[in-house]
Amino acid sequence: MTKSTFLFVYIILILGSMVNEIQGQNAICQKFLSETDCGAGSCTALCLQLWKGIGKCIKTDDHKLLCLCKYECIV
């Protein structure tokens, strides 16, 4: 009985770790949103609507503003 209980617990632990590996890891992804400009909170609103993330306007080297969206994703 003790061996079968130990074997059962061991199998459950192995299966649990396999499921965790299959599901993937959470990470922070980022994407430039060209569909919007950076005026009046539109970057933040679009990022929140599309990816449930946080949008922020950043300035490029040629002094243009681009919307950068950071969101949680699975890799």
Swiss-Prot record:
Its main location: secreted. Pfam families: SLR1-BP (PF07333). Disulfide bonds join 29-73, 38-57, 43-67, 47-69. GO terms for cellular component: extracellular region. Residues 1-24 form the signal peptide. GO terms for biological process: defense response to fungus; killing of cells of another organism. It is found in: Secreted. InterPro entries: DEFL (IPR010851). Keywords: Antimicrobial, Disulfide bond, Fungicide, Plant defense, Secreted, Signal. Belongs to the DEFL family. This is Defensin-like protein 127. It comes from Arabidopsis thaliana (Mouse-ear cress). The gene is LCR20.
